[in-house]
Amino acid sequence: MTIMAQVLHMDSSFPGKINPPVPPSLHAKDQEAPYSVETPYGYRLDLDFLKYVNDIEKGNTIKKVPVQRRPRYGSLPRGYGYTGSWWTSTESLCSNASMDSRHSSYSYCAPGFHTSQRPNFSTARVEKTLMDARRKLEEEKDGRRFSNLGSMHSSMAGSNTSLSSAHSFNRAQGGGSYTPMSSGLSTPVSPTPAHLQHVREQMAVALRKIRELEEQVKTIPVLQVKISVLQEEKRQLSVQLKSQKFLGHTLGFNRSRPRGELYIDIPEEEAGNGAGAANKATGSLSPTTPGSLQDSGCEIEETVIVAGARPGAKREVRTVGVGPEAEERGYRQVGVGVREQDLGLLPETEALKTKVGLLEVQLRKTMQELQSAQQQVEAAQKERQTVCPQVDHAVRATSLGWQDQQGQAGAGLHTVVSFTKQPHQQRTVGIQVYTLEQPTVVGVGTLLRAQGCTHPAQLEASHRRYGESPAAGDSPHEFPIAISSKQVREVLRSEVSKSVPVTNQATPMETKCNQVTAVCQRLKEGEINQQPAEEAIQVDPANPASPQSNLRSIMKRKADGEPGSPYTKKNLQFLGVNGGYESTSSEESSSESSEDESDASEYHEATEKLPESATPQSLVSSCIPQLASETPATQTAQHSTAQIPTNHTPAAQTTSQSHTTDATTQQHVTQSPAAEADVQHCVSQSSVTTTPPPEGDVQCVFQGCNPPSTATSLEQNSVQLSSATQQSKATDSNVQPDLAQTDVSDFAAQQTTTQTQFTSAKPQQEASQSKTADLTAQKGATHSTDGSAKQDIAISSTTKPAADTATPPTNKQTDSLELSGGLMSALHILQKALSEPNAFSHQDARTAYTSVLQEWLRVSCHKAADTAVVKAHMDAFASISPQLLEFVINMADGNGNTALHYTVSHSNFPVVKLLLDTGLCNADKQNKAGYTAIMLTALAAFSSDSDLQTVLQLLRTGDVNAKASQAGQTALMLAVSHGRGDMVKALLACGAQVNLRDDDGSTALMCACEHGHVDIVRQLLSVPGCDATLTDNDGSTALSIALEASQNDIAVLLYAHLNFAKPPSPVSPKSPILGSSPPSSSELK
């Protein structure tokens, strides 16, 4: 009975279908069934037939079972009766005529349900009850059509359960299909319990299959709605793809895609929430769904309600929904594809990478072309410099060293001159030169050492014109000689010096310069007398050789040529005696080759800083060029001496270029014998003319002159070197640091074009001035009637001396300048706060501090600050207390800059001097960037010598070796990086250390190499203790940095400094090694 009581009767039409009204007579018949039960969907079913079947089964004869109840919808058990689900089918089971005849409006007969058994009902009551039940079911069906429509959205019992069952009921109603008459009604037989059990089992199987089919059919409306929604979305997407081709199209996808997902997820998300959730889903469909789809939404609502009770149905809905979800993802991917294509990020990146690669390739090609072009230019320059003289004889030079002469008090210089018949190469190992001259003259300089720093000597030799045929000579030693002078740079990489052949129309002979009696003693005492008929060496007694002297110079020059013969070519050869290097330069008859030669010998610089307490001393080195004739008359020649102390500074580089034109003119003057005699300053035996060289750098001493019939006189240039020194710091306000750096090689190279010939005997004075304000100045040489010359050197800035007027004049009226009352009040408050601990925690102290700081910076820190105003304020501060003065002048702004920082940065050195004169200024205070005022001087510009003195005072006040907090750089590194050669000299003079490293491990020398400052590299290398082998954090040395930066000149300097500091193997055991120091004055005693 419980099973049959669950049989439901569904509406036969879809919602919205108008059914005919039920006649009132049908309602009256409902009350005639006393034995009935209320089904879960609000239908009443007569129980007479059920009662009868139950009585037959149990053997009971109960006639009436009054069941009068209307079950509450909420209390109805889910799956009451069987398998946890209501039977929602309206189909009738007719698998067997003997079953308990549950009736519906549609008969579904599966082939497997038919059996061969016949019904055995024989009782008229059973037949009557069956017919009555069928009739009442039909009436109840018609009567509930309108009630179903009214209670569809308000009652669970009044809602339809399945679209498929209602549809099948409608068909069954139209066909009028009832239980066939062959069910056994004509032959009633009492059923057995086994038969009834069999019927129940068949019914259960049939119901199970029907439920499965219903579950599948229920998804049809949902799928229809989804298909409609997806079609609409497809249409919208197609329209959007056609109309929107750029970034705007993504908005359309974002609007339509979530709506489609809502439709798809209705059965999953809303099933367990009851009718309210289903109503929400229906409401979301209604705005975009046509009227027919709204009706379908009602079906969806009911389907959700039923499916909520069946997990299987819920799972099936998800499975079916996979298809539309995949399709939706397809649209989503299309949107992504369009977005990437429209943006075009990846292609643009690839295009940029391709362009970068092409540019890098082009850059490499361009760099290669540039390097090849530079190599070609260098090769062309070398070819222009290379003019190999075609002569048949050459000069051979070897070193015999310092040897003790028998009967002599000291060491002498042994020189042997010889000729060979065929051209031979020249190999110069030491300082002695074999040359073919009838009388050989050798200039010997002072052989002294100072502070262990040696300097190169210079040897200048020229040959007679080509074409003269010399006679054969006998020389016990002959070496091949390379007569080319083009390989200037290669000279530094080897120990072989290239020489130029010297030809002379003379008889072969070998002359040994033996008469050098007491040379060393006379050098020490400052006097060297000339020896007749031999080489004459003399030092002016008025200026004896100073112990601070540090250079020995040997320089020879031979200007040959018969009177009237055209001047062909001159070659200069320089041999470094002490510095361990050699350089060769040649000069053609044109100014172009002269300039090339001037650049070719700039390879090494040896400088020595003198102690500050030392007074300027002149270094004496006299060279006596003399070409003695074969006649006795010419062997006795008069002599005269002249001495000009020099200071070789970078100024020589400027002046040497200015004299290039003069040198060119001088070469043309030598075309005539008279002009040649004038240029060479040939002097008669009775009179001597001494000509001061330009800038007072070179002094020539002439030891007689040959008659014009035999040969022209040979002029010799003597290099005079002296280092400028500082005077006492405490006694002299014009203290000048030892900034004069001697550069012998540069000097020798520059003098080849400017000082080998002289066109006038007029005194000249040059004061070189450079843009970088080099701290050098030279005073003109004064010459006396007896031929002696003296020159005083002072270190000063290269700007005009008149620039001293740049200092603002002191205004006398400012002595009465009075400060405002507010400032004075703030000063007193500040003074009081200084004597109290934690006084600046009070507001009035902080206010006073701010006021004083603003006023002090306003007065002192701008570019046009007046020294008078600043001094008046400082006097006011000091009148209150020296402590307050010290506190105020060291005040710093928000960036950590003090007044000293600002004044140095603005190059307002008069105010800087005022601050430093107080003795209270903190020169080592760093700003927030980590720089001190001393470091800022690397950018300051000097306008006068007084500014220089102020800078020196600042350098002495603070720590010149302090490092910046950011990169660890020192003031010397900053000055080097900015190319401030004057500041480099000043810093070195004040004790700056050259080997300090920054945070990257770089030294000042590496900075100079990287930025290509050749002069500064020379200055740094000249400092004793400068280590060129240091490496930075990357393992790079100064030489490797110069090579990477294509600084070839610097690389040559470094190579020479590194390699020629090591002495080569000696030629003989007694001879000094090339590159080593000569005997000092103490050793010669």
UniProtKB/Swiss-Prot annotation:
Residues 136-192, 273-295, 557-736, 752-791, 798-817, 1064-1085 are annotated as: Disordered. Residues 196-216, 356-383 form a coiled coil. Residues 589-600 have a biased composition (Acidic residues). InterPro entries: Ankyrin_rpt, Ankyrin_rpt-contain_sf, KANK1-4, KN_motif. It is found in: Cytoplasm; Mitochondrion. The keyword NAD does not apply. GO terms for biological process: apoptotic process; glomerular basement membrane development; negative regulation of actin filament polymerization; negative regulation of cell population proliferation; negative regulation of G1/S transition of mitotic cell cycle; negative regulation of intracellular estrogen receptor signaling pathway; negative regulation of transcription by RNA polymerase II; negative regulation of vitamin D receptor signaling pathway. Residues 136-145, 601-611 have a biased composition (Basic and acidic residues). One of its GO terms (cellular component) is cytoplasm. ANK repeats lie at residues 895-925, 929-962, 967-996, 1000-1030, 1034-1063. Keywords: ANK repeat, Apoptosis, Coiled coil, Cytoplasm, Methylation, Mitochondrion, Phosphoprotein, Repeat, Transcription, Transcription regulation. SMART domains: ANK. It comes from the Eukaryota. Disruption phenotype: Morpholino knockdown of the protein results in an edematous phenotype and proteinuria. Podocyte foot process effacement and disorganization, rarefaction of slit membranes, and disorganization of the glomerular basement membrane in glomeruli which are characteritic of nephrosis are observed. May be involved in different biological processes including transcription and apoptosis by sequestering specific proteins outside of the nucleus. Involved in actin stress fibers formation probably through its interaction with ARHGDIA and the regulation of the Rho signaling pathway. May thereby play a role in cell adhesion and migration, regulating for instance podocytes migration during development of the kidney. This is KN motif and ankyrin repeat domain-containing protein 2.
